[in-house]
Design a protein with these regions (language model features):
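Charged alpha-helical initiation segments
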Residues: 1-44, 51, 55
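Amphipathic alpha-helical interface elements that mediate macromolecular binding in regulatory proteins
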Residues: 43-46, 126
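Charge-enriched, short contiguous segments at helix-coil
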Residues: 131-140
């Protein structure tokens, strides 16, 4: 796996999010704010999760063929969940330019339910699928 490739993309996404936080005062009351820039970040971040999950799937012993029937969530992330308990991993938002006070917004488990599909999946996945498949309807 080319770790530098993923790391560089991650750092770029992080920089863009921090730049956005200079424009939008991100606090507990602003989490419903929507913009095309946020949609773009959601799509690009989700694509990176898809890509790295598939690469890790094969590195960690996944056996399904790499074709249209290999799903990043129910196949790749499910295998990684069984090995690493990804759903229990916590990310803490600690940037001083995010004005979050509620613990539910500071301590995140972004991969909780990420190995599921549809209405059972993670909120970010539902948003990603909605924006990816019907952007015009999803932003109204």
């Amino acid at each position: 796996m080319n770790n530098n490739l993923y790391w560089n993309v991650y750092k770029s996404l992080e920089r863009e999010l921090l730049k956005l936080a200079e424009i939008i005062h991100i606090d507990d009351g602003q989490l419903g704010v929507y913009s095309m820039k946020i949609a773009d970040l959601l799509i690009r971040t989700s694509v990176e999760i898809e890509s790295i999950s598939k690469e890790l799937y094969f590195r960690e012993g996944g056996t399904k063929p790499d074709d249209k029937d290999l799903y990043f969530d129910t196949d790749c992330l499910a295998l990684l969940e069984s090995k690493w308990s990804l759903s229990k991993k916590v990310v803490m938002i600690s940037s001083p330019i995010f004005y979050l006070k509620e613990d539910d917004n500071i301590y995140l488990t972004p991969l909780h339910k990420a190995h599921k599909r549809g209405t059972s999946s993670a909120d970010w996945q539902k948003a990603y699928q909605a924006v990816k498949h019907n952007r015009a309807k999803s932003i109204n």
